[in-house]
Amino acid sequence: MSSAEALAFDVIVIGGGHAGCEAASAAARAGARTALVTHRFDTIGVMSCNPAIGGLGKGHLVREIDALDGLMGRVADRAGIQFRLLNRRKGPAVRGPRTQADRKLYRLSMQQMITEQENLTVVEGGAADLVCDGERISGVTLADGRVLKCGAVVLTTGTFLNGLIHIGEKRFPAGRMGEKPALGLSERLLSFGFTLGRLKTGTPPRLDGRTIDWQSLDMQSADEEPVPFSLMTDRITTPQIECGITRTTPETHDIIRANLHRSAMYSGSIEGIGPRYCPSVEDKIVKFGNRDGHQIFLEPEGLDDDTVYPNGISTSLPEDVQLEILKTIPGLEKAVLLQPGYAIEYDFIDPRELKRSLETRKVCGLFLAGQINGTTGYEEAGAQGLLAGLNAARRAAGSEPVILQRTEAYIGVMVDDLTSRGVSEPYRMFTSRAEFRLSLRADNADQRLTPLADEVGILSEERRKRYLTRETALSHARMVTQSLSITPNLAGYYDLRLNQDGVRRSAYDLLSYPDINLDRLIAIWPELASIDPVTREALEIEAQYAVYMERQQSDIAVMEREERLLIPSGLDFDAISGLSNELKQKLKQRKPETIAEAQRVDGITPAAVALLIAQIRKFGGRQKLAAETLEGKGAA
């Protein structure tokens, strides 16, 4: 960056974590000249906490990131060392692909993809301040005095925003262990009028795997046939490993209870609220003290790394207490502690300050993604980063933003939850958060989102070809199975028990029966044997859900109609007779743009919605496709 021209970009992304990498890549793929600002290049893609990607709900997000040509799925496929499909025995809608990852492989693979991305420049340095021209972002000032000009900024600070690490009675500023926090940006955000809060997360101690008694432990293997995250991955080639399973003991619990006053969580040192679904071991003992033990997964951090991550004992107890705890856990009696567990507090912004494009309402061109929005988890961060980066590029180019609806993607569910409801604790994704789980499956993420990625210009030619090849194969298989039919009487000859109503049923219809798969149908129609395994699985799942999907479409249509009914920007909520003063205040503060958004405002009632619709009609509001106007007219 030797010339003045090199200091001007369309989009600047601050932070090289999971949100930052996806944001920078998406902005660059969208054609924006993009800068990724990070303290050090070698920390790009670091897995700060657990060495794993995916899981229940989270695996859906990774598949959606991949369907939009993001990075996380491909990187996880390269670095994954223990692939497991969670909820395999349940329906496809709630299955969760997951892998443990080699930390080093993951980081290096992510850095390689960032380096190879066109339109993307990595700028080493700390972001000290944001530069504005009126109420519009115009640049970033670095700690060394350099000023980078831009049309949009994506802020992905993770736990670095006023980060504070706690280990027992000790506490010190840090973004994560061994790295400095970002101290200046919080003041700038406060000056913009944003509402900031404090959240907390934690991590367990790291252990020397050579000092663990693996022989005494139960071991968990990877799936025999690993299921990749990415459409671009033909098969997993990285060696797969086992992890160990152990449990805390009553003696463990006694030590924790005796030292609760020394835990940062229970001594009053920590202000922030921690994640409900990833509690510290202190929380587990206090809240579930009647249990004899709590499960711990001992996850190796790499193929050539002896470090082990004990998943299940996140803690902020003093180091000496952590050592005592280890001695009471089977298999860990002689384990050497390489790094103590710790809690970390950090600033976040109330995500209700955001539009669904992830642009802030107060500052034009400023986008937020990841833990700064109150979420927890790599996958949640990466998904937000991709959407924020794409929309930052579109903002810089003067284009309308891309809004993902709740009916389209788990990303849409998450963003809508954040921007309409806010957070009282770190938010993580679950399949139960989605109203239309049957539609939003991990296996159909490509069908749902890849055409959109192509439409907005962030899809590579290689992925386009692969997607079209797969869709063509599925379409042909669907056509063939729908063209073949059989009577109930003849089906009985092949031991298929159908209702004897005389109605012919197609092979496609038969696949909806729980005890019928393609293998059984090949006995009737041998030509079906030519369908390849990937297409076969997709066809079976599609046919299985076809009837239920038809029923769900009416519910989806209702929600889509509500999304289309726009609330005019000039509507005076105070003038709506019959609304309580409390609701008027909430609506003025929240500024919902559609009836669907208004329905998700706390305290809104069906009667209040009816009053609001009547006022819109009186005002002269009219229905238009949300895709044509939402976030792009009054929100622009």
UniProtKB/Swiss-Prot annotation:
The keyword Zinc-finger does not apply. One of its GO terms (cellular component) is cytosol. Keywords: Cytoplasm, FAD, Flavoprotein, NAD, tRNA processing. InterPro entries: FAD/NAD-bd_sf, GIDA_C_N, MnmG, MnmG-rel, MnmG-rel_CS, MnmG_C, MnmG_C_subdom, MnmG_C_subdom_sf. Its cofactor is FAD. NAD(+) binds at residues 274-288. SUPFAM superfamilies: FAD/NAD(P)-binding domain. Its main location: cytoplasm. It comes from the Bacteria. FAD binds at residues 15-20. GO terms for molecular function: flavin adenine dinucleotide binding. GO terms for biological process: tRNA methylation; tRNA wobble uridine modification. NCBIfam families: mnmG_gidA (TIGR00136). Homodimer. Heterotetramer of two MnmE and two MnmG subunits. NAD-binding protein involved in the addition of a carboxymethylaminomethyl (cmnm) group at the wobble position (U34) of certain tRNAs, forming tRNA-cmnm(5)s(2)U34. This is tRNA uridine 5-carboxymethylaminomethyl modification enzyme MnmG. The lineage of its organism: Bacteria, Pseudomonadati, Pseudomonadota, Alphaproteobacteria, Hyphomicrobiales.
